[in-house]
């Protein structure tokens, strides 16, 4: 149809040029010629009166009779020139248009009315090709150039009308189509892949990277993380939903988390304060500790010697460990690490289990008690017997 449009345009242009040759010529005034002849007659009469012997030249005198009625020439209204007779190309064009209208009416018939035989369609096609060829020949005979602009890469036929240059080839506009959906691309934008043309929709659907979150094609900016591609607005914390900033992200079980939520959810907790351990830490008692949190559970002093005592899951210094265990010497108040003597509900270093009066060591284990103090028998008798 594009070839037909181009041929019609050339034919119309040639018809307009032919019509311009029939121009309207303005008629001469009615009495212009008669007035000119009368003036010449009068002039010739006056010249004949002159005396050839008179040395003085005779001047011509023109008279005008004002009583005569003024005569004006009348200009006729221009008339349209009759249209030129139709050429054989125009007649053939009319026949072609009628034939096309008939074919279009037949195509619009409902499908359930039955398809026409293939031979009839081929006859119409052959007839149309023949008429197009004849029209092209007539235009050439009229001097109208019909040189093709190349051959269509799809149908391999000459291109006379509109042409599209793409992929290093020439195409009829209706033949330059998307490789996938077969829709006409025409002069619209398209994408090329492996020498084939695709409309933007199909190209993105087939070849654009997919967002790992929404699975939709990524058309603009793409973010690559965790061996996947994402829309920038879809790469956010799996817990709080905030988009990651310059601080980056942490990965756990193939899910991204912001630093705050990752540490709160997955970082080891301090055995003292139960907060996430972020930087320096101590490992003791099968858990981790902030250095400032690993102290005695009673006096909160750090373990400068590097040793501690564990009781009920908490660290203690030696003194408070023995105090809670009840293993402090009742005499000196220091922890008992070796042998001990238990008496009066207390524990003593052997050397500190002595008489409260004479300080004699009660090594034999025989003693007397008075007011929570230990005495040997002689001192007890001396001090408390009547």
Curated annotation (Swiss-Prot):
Phosphorylated on tyrosine residues. Phosphorylation on Tyr-72 is important for its inhibitory function. Bombesin stimulates phosphorylation on Tyr-22, Tyr-62 and Tyr-72. A motif (LD motif 1) lies at residues 3-15. Residues 33-44 have a biased composition (Basic and acidic residues). One of its GO terms (molecular function) is metal ion binding. Residues 150-209, 210-267, 268-327, 328-386 form the LIM zinc-binding domain. The modification N-acetylmethionine is found at residue 1. Residues 12-51 are annotated as: Disordered. InterPro entries: Tgfb1i1/Leupaxin/TGFB1I1, Znf_LIM. Keywords: Acetylation, Activator, Cell adhesion, Cell junction, Cell membrane, Cell projection, Cytoplasm, LIM domain, Membrane, Metal-binding, Nucleus, Phosphoprotein, Repeat, Transcription, Transcription regulation, Zinc. GO terms for biological process: endothelial cell migration; negative regulation of B cell receptor signaling pathway; substrate adhesion-dependent cell spreading; transforming growth factor beta receptor signaling pathway. Its main location: cytoplasm. Residues 16-26 have a biased composition (Polar residues). Transcriptional coactivator for androgen receptor (AR) and serum response factor (SRF). Contributes to the regulation of cell adhesion, spreading and cell migration and acts as a negative regulator in integrin-mediated cell adhesion events. Suppresses the integrin-induced tyrosine phosphorylation of paxillin (PXN). May play a critical role as an adapter protein in the formation of the adhesion zone in osteoclasts. Negatively regulates B-cell antigen receptor (BCR) signaling. Interacts with unphosphorylated ITGA4. Interacts with AR and SRF. Interacts with PTK2B/PYK2, PTPN22 and PTPN12. Interacts (via LD motif 3) with LYN and the interaction is induced upon B-cell antigen receptor (BCR) activation. Interacts (via LD motif 3) with PTK2/FAK. This is Leupaxin. The gene is LPXN.
């Amino acid at each position: 149809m594009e070839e037909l449009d181009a041929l019609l345009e050339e034919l119309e242009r040639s018809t307009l040029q032919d019509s311009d040759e029939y121009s309207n010529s303005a008629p001469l005034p009615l009495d212009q010629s008669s007035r000119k002849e009368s003036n010449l007659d009068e002039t010739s009469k006056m010249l004949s009166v002159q005396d050839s012997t008179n040395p003085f030249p005779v001047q011509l005198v023109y008279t005008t009779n004002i009583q005569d009625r003024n005569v004006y020439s009348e200009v006729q209204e221009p008339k349209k020139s009759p249209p030129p007779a139709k050429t054989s190309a125009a007649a053939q064009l009319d026949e072609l248009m009628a034939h096309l209208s008939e074919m279009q009416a037949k195509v619009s018939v409902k499908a359930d009315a039955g398809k026409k035989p293939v031979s009839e369609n081929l006859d119409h096609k052959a007839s149309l090709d023949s008429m197009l060829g004849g029209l092209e020949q007539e235009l050439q005979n009229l001097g109208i150039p019909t040189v093709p602009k190349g051959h269509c890469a799809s149908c391999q036929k000459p291109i006379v009308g509109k042409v599209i240059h793409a992929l290093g080839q020439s195409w009829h506009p209706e033949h330059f189509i998307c490789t996938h959906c077969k829709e006409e691309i025409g002069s619209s934008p398209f994408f090329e892949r492996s020498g084939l043309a695709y409309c933007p929709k199909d190209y993105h659907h087939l070849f654009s990277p997919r967002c790992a979150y929404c699975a939709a094609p990524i058309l603009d900016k793409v973010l690559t993380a965790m061996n996947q591609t994402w829309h920038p607005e879809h790469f956010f914390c799996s817990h709080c939903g905030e988009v990651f900033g310059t601080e980056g992200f942490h990965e756990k079980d193939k899910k991204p988390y912001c630093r705050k939520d990752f540490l709160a959810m997955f970082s080891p907790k301090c055995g003292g304060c139960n907060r996430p351990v972020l930087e320096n830490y101590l490992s003791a008692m099968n858990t981790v500790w902030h250095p400032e949190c690993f102290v005695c559970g009673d006096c909160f002093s750090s373990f400068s010697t590097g040793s501690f005592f564990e009781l009920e899951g908490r660290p203690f210094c030696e003194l408070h460990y023995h105090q809670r265990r009840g293993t402090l010497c009742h005499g000196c108040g220091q922890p008992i690490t070796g042998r001990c003597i238990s008496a009066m509900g207390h524990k003593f270093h052997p050397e500190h289990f002595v008489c409260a009066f004479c300080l004699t060591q009660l090594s034999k284990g025989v003693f007397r008690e008075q007011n929570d103090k230990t005495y040997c028998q002689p001192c007890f008798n001396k001090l408390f017997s009547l």
